[in-house]
Protein backbone atom coordinates (compact mmCIF):
# COMPACT_ATOMS: atom_id res chain seq x y z
CA UNK A 1 0.00 0.00 0.00
CA UNK A 2 2.78 2.44 0.90
CA UNK A 3 4.72 1.63 -2.28
CA UNK A 4 1.54 1.98 -4.34
CA UNK A 5 0.86 5.42 -2.86
CA UNK A 6 4.43 6.53 -3.54
CA UNK A 7 4.14 5.22 -7.12
CA UNK A 8 0.92 7.20 -7.65
CA UNK A 9 2.57 10.34 -6.29
CA UNK A 10 5.59 9.97 -8.59
CA UNK A 11 3.42 9.15 -11.61
CA UNK A 12 1.15 12.11 -10.92
CA UNK A 13 4.18 14.35 -10.54
CA UNK A 14 5.57 13.25 -13.91
CA UNK A 15 2.22 13.64 -15.70
CA UNK A 16 1.65 17.09 -14.19
CA UNK A 17 5.19 18.14 -15.02
CA UNK A 18 4.90 17.00 -18.64
CA UNK A 19 1.46 18.52 -19.24
CA UNK A 20 2.21 21.85 -17.62
CA UNK A 21 5.65 22.00 -19.22
CA UNK A 22 4.08 21.56 -22.65
CA UNK A 23 1.47 24.23 -21.99
CA UNK A 24 3.44 26.84 -20.11
CA UNK A 25 7.13 26.14 -20.57
CA UNK A 26 9.34 23.77 -18.63
CA UNK A 27 11.34 26.44 -16.82
CA UNK A 28 8.25 27.96 -15.21
CA UNK A 29 6.68 24.56 -14.59
CA UNK A 30 9.82 23.27 -12.87
CA UNK A 31 9.60 26.04 -10.30
CA UNK A 32 5.93 25.40 -9.49
CA UNK A 33 5.80 21.59 -9.55
CA UNK A 34 9.17 20.96 -7.96
CA UNK A 35 8.53 23.63 -5.33
CA UNK A 36 5.14 22.17 -4.38
CA UNK A 37 6.51 18.63 -4.26
CA UNK A 38 9.53 19.63 -2.17
CA UNK A 39 7.39 21.67 0.23
CA UNK A 40 4.84 18.92 0.87
CA UNK A 41 7.37 16.09 1.01
CA UNK A 42 9.67 17.93 3.40
CA UNK A 43 6.99 18.72 5.95
CA UNK A 44 5.43 15.25 5.65
CA UNK A 45 8.77 13.56 6.33
CA UNK A 46 9.40 15.88 9.29
CA UNK A 47 5.94 15.06 10.63
CA UNK A 48 6.61 11.33 10.23
CA UNK A 49 10.06 11.39 11.82
CA UNK A 50 9.40 13.86 14.63
CA UNK A 51 5.66 13.27 15.13
CA UNK A 52 6.19 11.24 18.33
CA UNK A 53 7.99 14.19 19.92
CA UNK A 54 5.05 16.48 19.12
CA UNK A 55 2.54 13.93 20.44
CA UNK A 56 4.50 13.43 23.67
CA UNK A 57 4.59 17.17 24.25
CA UNK A 58 0.93 17.78 23.37
CA UNK A 59 -0.37 15.00 25.64
CA UNK A 60 2.31 15.39 28.36
CA UNK A 61 2.97 11.67 28.05
CA UNK A 62 4.57 9.82 30.96
CA UNK A 63 6.45 6.63 30.08
CA UNK A 64 5.45 3.56 32.08
CA UNK A 65 7.68 0.62 32.96
CA UNK A 66 6.85 -2.80 34.40
CA UNK A 67 7.97 -1.73 37.90
CA UNK A 68 5.82 1.41 37.96
CA UNK A 69 3.91 1.32 41.30
CA UNK A 70 0.77 2.87 39.82
CA UNK A 71 0.59 1.79 36.18
CA UNK A 72 2.90 -1.21 36.00
CA UNK A 73 -0.14 -3.42 35.44
CA UNK A 74 -0.97 -1.40 32.30
CA UNK A 75 2.52 -2.14 30.98
CA UNK A 76 1.93 -5.84 31.70
CA UNK A 77 -1.37 -5.78 29.78
CA UNK A 78 0.34 -4.23 26.75
CA UNK A 79 3.09 -6.84 26.98
CA UNK A 80 0.50 -9.63 27.10
CA UNK A 81 -1.37 -8.29 24.07
CA UNK A 82 1.87 -7.74 22.15
CA UNK A 83 2.73 -11.39 22.81
CA UNK A 84 -0.70 -12.48 21.52
CA UNK A 85 0.07 -10.53 18.33
CA UNK A 86 3.62 -11.87 17.98
CA UNK A 87 4.88 -8.29 18.01
CA UNK A 88 7.77 -6.59 19.77
CA UNK A 89 6.88 -4.61 22.85
CA UNK A 90 6.06 -0.95 22.14
CA UNK A 91 6.88 1.83 24.57
CA UNK A 92 3.94 2.46 26.88
CA UNK A 93 2.78 5.89 28.02
CA UNK A 94 0.03 7.29 30.22
CA UNK A 95 -1.52 10.62 29.23
CA UNK A 96 -2.86 12.79 32.10
CA UNK A 97 -5.60 14.46 30.04
CA UNK A 98 -9.32 14.80 30.71
CA UNK A 99 -10.82 12.53 28.03
CA UNK A 100 -10.77 8.75 27.53
CA UNK A 101 -8.68 7.60 24.60
CA UNK A 102 -5.88 5.30 23.54
CA UNK A 103 -3.67 5.73 20.50
CA UNK A 104 -0.65 4.22 18.81
CA UNK A 105 2.06 6.09 16.94
CA UNK A 106 5.42 5.26 15.44
CA UNK A 107 8.36 6.55 13.43
CA UNK A 108 11.77 5.23 12.33
CA UNK A 109 13.48 7.42 14.93
CA UNK A 110 11.27 6.65 17.93
CA UNK A 111 9.95 3.17 17.18
CA UNK A 112 6.49 1.87 18.16
CA UNK A 113 4.58 3.64 20.92
CA UNK A 114 1.22 3.35 22.64
CA UNK A 115 -0.51 5.78 24.98
CA UNK A 116 -3.57 5.41 27.21
CA UNK A 117 -5.23 8.35 28.93
CA UNK A 118 -5.99 8.23 32.64
CA UNK A 119 -9.79 8.57 32.25
CA UNK A 120 -9.79 5.49 30.00
CA UNK A 121 -7.90 3.54 32.66
CA UNK A 122 -10.40 4.67 35.29
CA UNK A 123 -13.68 3.98 33.48
CA UNK A 124 -12.88 0.58 31.92
CA UNK A 125 -12.22 -2.76 33.55
CA UNK A 126 -9.01 -4.64 32.78
CA UNK A 127 -10.59 -6.90 30.15
CA UNK A 128 -11.95 -3.87 28.30
CA UNK A 129 -8.59 -2.11 28.51
CA UNK A 130 -6.97 -5.23 27.08
CA UNK A 131 -9.44 -5.17 24.17
CA UNK A 132 -8.66 -1.50 23.49
CA UNK A 133 -4.94 -2.32 23.58
CA UNK A 134 -5.63 -5.09 21.05
CA UNK A 135 -7.16 -2.46 18.78
CA UNK A 136 -4.13 -0.18 19.08
CA UNK A 137 -1.68 -3.04 18.63
CA UNK A 138 -3.60 -3.79 15.44
CA UNK A 139 -2.73 -0.31 14.16
CA UNK A 140 0.95 -0.97 14.85
CA UNK A 141 0.85 -4.45 13.29
CA UNK A 142 -0.80 -3.15 10.14
CA UNK A 143 1.52 -0.12 9.90
CA UNK A 144 -1.47 2.19 9.68
CA UNK A 145 0.53 5.30 10.55
CA UNK A 146 2.81 4.83 7.56
CA UNK A 147 0.02 3.82 5.18
CA UNK A 148 -2.26 6.74 6.00
CA UNK A 149 0.62 9.21 5.94
CA UNK A 150 1.69 8.01 2.48
CA UNK A 151 -1.83 8.11 1.05
CA UNK A 152 -2.59 11.52 2.56
CA UNK A 153 0.41 12.87 0.63
CA UNK A 154 -1.61 12.62 -2.58
CA UNK A 155 -4.40 15.15 -1.79
CA UNK A 156 -1.93 17.38 0.04
CA UNK A 157 0.33 17.52 -3.01
CA UNK A 158 -2.69 18.09 -5.27
CA UNK A 159 -3.82 20.98 -3.10
CA UNK A 160 -0.47 22.75 -2.96
CA UNK A 161 0.17 22.21 -6.66
CA UNK A 162 -3.29 23.57 -7.44
CA UNK A 163 -2.77 26.47 -5.06
CA UNK A 164 0.53 27.34 -6.76
CA UNK A 165 -1.01 27.16 -10.24
CA UNK A 166 -3.99 29.20 -9.10
CA UNK A 167 -1.70 32.01 -7.98
CA UNK A 168 0.39 31.57 -11.11
CA UNK A 169 -2.72 32.13 -13.19
CA UNK A 170 -3.70 35.20 -11.18
CA UNK A 171 -0.24 36.66 -11.65
CA UNK A 172 -0.31 36.17 -15.40
CA UNK A 173 1.13 32.71 -16.10
CA UNK A 174 4.63 31.74 -17.07
CA UNK A 175 5.20 34.49 -19.59
CA UNK A 176 7.46 32.37 -21.77
CA UNK A 177 5.23 29.34 -22.17
CA UNK A 178 3.90 27.84 -25.35
CA UNK A 179 0.57 29.61 -24.97
CA UNK A 180 1.10 31.94 -22.00
CA UNK A 181 -2.51 31.18 -21.10
CA UNK A 182 -2.91 32.36 -17.52
CA UNK A 183 -6.63 31.56 -17.62
CA UNK A 184 -5.96 27.89 -18.31
CA UNK A 185 -3.32 27.84 -15.58
CA UNK A 186 -5.86 29.31 -13.16
CA UNK A 187 -8.48 26.74 -14.19
CA UNK A 188 -6.11 23.78 -13.74
CA UNK A 189 -5.28 25.09 -10.27
CA UNK A 190 -8.96 25.28 -9.30
CA UNK A 191 -9.59 21.75 -10.60
CA UNK A 192 -6.64 20.33 -8.65
CA UNK A 193 -7.81 22.02 -5.44
CA UNK A 194 -11.32 20.60 -5.94
CA UNK A 195 -9.97 17.11 -6.67
CA UNK A 196 -7.80 17.27 -3.53
CA UNK A 197 -10.91 17.80 -1.39
CA UNK A 198 -12.65 14.86 -3.07
CA UNK A 199 -9.59 12.68 -2.54
CA UNK A 200 -9.59 13.63 1.14
CA UNK A 201 -12.97 11.90 1.41
CA UNK A 202 -11.26 8.74 0.14
CA UNK A 203 -8.54 9.19 2.77
CA UNK A 204 -11.25 9.35 5.45
CA UNK A 205 -12.81 6.19 4.00
CA UNK A 206 -9.44 4.45 4.13
CA UNK A 207 -9.01 5.61 7.72
CA UNK A 208 -12.38 4.10 8.65
CA UNK A 209 -11.33 0.84 7.00
CA UNK A 210 -8.13 0.75 9.07
CA UNK A 211 -10.14 1.40 12.24
CA UNK A 212 -12.47 -1.48 11.41
CA UNK A 213 -9.47 -3.68 10.65
CA UNK A 214 -8.00 -2.80 14.06
CA UNK A 215 -11.32 -3.71 15.71
CA UNK A 216 -11.19 -7.11 14.04
CA UNK A 217 -7.60 -7.56 15.18
CA UNK A 218 -8.71 -7.13 18.79
CA UNK A 219 -11.63 -9.51 18.30
CA UNK A 220 -9.44 -12.26 16.85
CA UNK A 221 -6.35 -12.01 19.06
CA UNK A 222 -7.76 -11.14 22.51
CA UNK A 223 -9.94 -13.50 24.60
CA UNK A 224 -13.51 -12.12 24.42
CA UNK A 225 -12.02 -9.16 22.58
CA UNK A 226 -15.14 -8.39 20.52
CA UNK A 227 -17.61 -8.10 23.41
CA UNK A 228 -15.15 -6.26 25.65
CA UNK A 229 -14.31 -3.78 22.90
CA UNK A 230 -18.03 -3.16 22.37
CA UNK A 231 -18.62 -2.20 26.00
CA UNK A 232 -15.39 -0.18 26.01
CA UNK A 233 -16.63 1.89 23.05
CA UNK A 234 -19.96 2.43 24.80
CA UNK A 235 -18.29 3.55 28.04
CA UNK A 236 -16.16 6.07 26.16
CA UNK A 237 -19.28 7.61 24.62
CA UNK A 238 -21.12 7.57 27.97
CA UNK A 239 -18.19 9.37 29.58
CA UNK A 240 -18.23 12.13 26.97
CA UNK A 241 -22.04 12.31 26.91
CA UNK A 242 -23.44 11.14 30.29
CA UNK A 243 -27.08 11.63 29.27
CA UNK A 244 -26.97 9.43 26.19
CA UNK A 245 -28.32 6.28 27.85
CA UNK A 246 -31.39 8.11 29.14
CA UNK A 247 -32.01 9.58 25.69
CA UNK A 248 -31.69 6.16 24.12
CA UNK A 249 -34.26 4.79 26.56
CA UNK A 250 -36.62 7.60 25.62
CA UNK A 251 -35.82 7.07 21.92
CA UNK A 252 -35.03 10.72 21.47
CA UNK A 253 -31.88 12.50 20.44
CA UNK A 254 -28.96 11.23 18.42
CA UNK A 255 -26.06 9.05 19.34
CA UNK A 256 -22.73 10.75 19.98
CA UNK A 257 -20.06 10.05 17.42
CA UNK A 258 -16.99 8.19 18.53
CA UNK A 259 -14.08 10.20 19.81
CA UNK A 260 -15.88 13.53 20.01
CA UNK A 261 -14.50 14.61 23.33
CA UNK A 262 -15.75 17.31 25.62
CA UNK A 263 -14.70 18.83 28.88
CA UNK A 264 -17.81 17.63 30.68
CA UNK A 265 -17.15 17.09 34.37
CA UNK A 266 -18.32 13.52 34.92
CA UNK A 267 -17.41 10.77 37.33
CA UNK A 268 -13.88 9.50 36.86
CA UNK A 269 -14.78 6.03 38.10
CA UNK A 270 -15.50 2.79 36.28
CA UNK A 271 -18.79 3.04 34.40
CA UNK A 272 -21.26 0.24 35.22
CA UNK A 273 -21.31 -2.46 32.56
CA UNK A 274 -25.12 -2.57 32.44
CA UNK A 275 -25.21 1.04 31.21
CA UNK A 276 -22.69 0.26 28.51
CA UNK A 277 -24.62 -2.83 27.49
CA UNK A 278 -27.83 -0.83 27.10
CA UNK A 279 -26.06 1.47 24.66
CA UNK A 280 -24.49 -1.48 22.82
CA UNK A 281 -27.94 -3.07 22.45
CA UNK A 282 -29.31 0.18 21.05
CA UNK A 283 -26.51 0.42 18.49
CA UNK A 284 -27.21 -3.17 17.43
CA UNK A 285 -30.67 -2.16 16.23
CA UNK A 286 -29.90 1.38 15.09
CA UNK A 287 -30.19 1.92 11.36
CA UNK A 288 -27.47 4.16 9.98
CA UNK A 289 -27.07 5.35 6.42
CA UNK A 290 -24.10 4.92 4.14
CA UNK A 291 -23.29 8.62 4.49
CA UNK A 292 -23.59 8.70 8.29
CA UNK A 293 -19.82 8.82 8.75
CA UNK A 294 -18.75 10.20 5.36
CA UNK A 295 -16.71 13.02 6.89
CA UNK A 296 -15.47 11.09 9.92
CA UNK A 297 -12.19 9.22 10.31
CA UNK A 298 -13.91 6.60 12.51
CA UNK A 299 -16.85 4.37 11.58
CA UNK A 300 -20.20 5.17 13.18
CA UNK A 301 -20.43 3.35 16.55
CA UNK A 302 -23.39 1.28 15.35
CA UNK A 303 -21.34 0.00 12.41
CA UNK A 304 -18.48 -0.94 14.73
CA UNK A 305 -20.79 -2.81 17.09
CA UNK A 306 -22.42 -4.74 14.25
CA UNK A 307 -19.03 -5.66 12.80
CA UNK A 308 -17.79 -6.88 16.19
CA UNK A 309 -20.99 -8.93 16.60
CA UNK A 310 -19.74 -11.11 13.76
CA UNK A 311 -16.72 -12.05 15.88
CA UNK A 312 -18.24 -12.46 19.35
CA UNK A 313 -18.28 -16.24 18.93
CA UNK A 314 -14.96 -16.41 17.11
CA UNK A 315 -12.18 -18.53 18.53
CA UNK A 316 -9.36 -16.22 19.55
CA UNK A 317 -5.82 -17.32 18.93
CA UNK A 318 -2.40 -15.68 19.26
CA UNK A 319 -0.73 -14.69 16.01
CA UNK A 320 1.73 -17.37 14.94
Curated annotation (Swiss-Prot):
What Gene Ontology cellular component terms go with this record? plasma membrane
* Coiled coil start-end: none
Q: Where in the cell is it found?
A: Cell membrane
- Predominant place of localization: membrane
User: For this protein, what is the EC number?
Assistant: 3.4.24.-
MF GO annotations: metalloendopeptidase activity; zinc ion binding
What is the membrane topology listed in the Swiss-Prot or TrEMBL record? Multi-pass membrane protein
Q: Where are the transmembrane segments?
A: 6-26, 31-51, 147-167, 185-205
Spell out the catalytic residues: 136
Keywords associated with the record: Cell membrane, Hydrolase, Membrane, Metal-binding, Metalloprotease, Protease, Transmembrane, Transmembrane helix, Zinc
**Which annotated residues bind Zn(2+)?**
135, 139, 211
Listed Pfam families: Peptidase_M48 (PF01435)
Its needed co-factors are: Zn(2+)
* Free-text comment on the cofactor: Binds 1 zinc ion per subunit.
Q: Name one GO biological process term.
A: proteolysis
Keyword presence, Zinc: yes
Q: Which InterPro entries match?
A: HtpX_protease (IPR050083), Pept_M48_protease_HtpX (IPR022919), Peptidase_M48 (IPR001915)
Q: Family, per the entry? A: Belongs to the peptidase M48B family.
In its UniProt entry, what is this protein called? Protease HtpX homolog 2
Q: Which organism is it from?
A: Sulfolobus acidocaldarius (strain ATCC 33909 / DSM 639 / JCM 8929 / NBRC 15157 / NCIMB 11770)
Gene name tied to this protein = htpX2
Amino acid sequence: MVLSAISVIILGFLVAYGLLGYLFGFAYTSIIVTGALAFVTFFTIIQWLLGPLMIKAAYRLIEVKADDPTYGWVYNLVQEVATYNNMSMPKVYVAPVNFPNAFAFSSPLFGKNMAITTPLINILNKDEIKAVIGHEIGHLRHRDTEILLAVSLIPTLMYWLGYSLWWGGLLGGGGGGRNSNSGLLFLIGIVLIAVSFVFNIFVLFLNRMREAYADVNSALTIPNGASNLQTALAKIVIYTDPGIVDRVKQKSGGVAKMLLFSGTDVSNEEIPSYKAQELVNYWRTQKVGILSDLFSDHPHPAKRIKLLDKFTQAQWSPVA
